[in-house]
A protein has these predicted regions:
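Glycine-rich phosphate-binding loops of nucleotide-dependent enzymes
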Residues: 1-115
Length: 115
């Protein structure tokens, strides 16, 4: 297999609750390095919650996150950034005076590996 298509990260049995509301229930998926991925679903399906957990904005209540095959804890965005994970927020969280590219790299420090 080509090195560029190895598993970059995976969510295993991730659950996230906000009080009595279960936003994500036992979610598992993997993302391959070098691919293009989309997260799609209805409003309220938990897409933003999944992305915010990957970016370290919310901790999962249960389950595990693996990065390059190793169990990892992404509890703050700085950890995600150090792993090469970036996030482009929805329109209301973008900086309107910046270009698309500048919004993408906002807060990004140079690294040897990116997702």
């Amino acid at each position: 297999m080509n090195e560029s298509f190895h598993e970059a990260f995976s969510f295993c049995n991730i659950t996230k609750n906000f009080g009595s509301l279960r936003a994500n229930d036992n979610v598992s998926f993997s993302v391959l390095n070098g691919g293009i991925h989309g997260v799609v679903g209805e409003n309220g399906a938990g897409k933003s919650t999944i992305m915010k957990m990957l970016y370290g904005m919310f901790p999962p209540d249960s389950g595990e996150i693996f990065f390059k095959g190793k169990k990892t804890k992404i509890s703050v965005p700085e950890t995600a950034i150090a792993l090469g994970i970036g996030m482009v927020h929805q329109h209301f969280m973008l900086v309107p005076t910046l270009t698309v590219w500048q919004n993408i790299i906002l807060g990004k420090e140079p690294s040897l590996w990116t997702l």
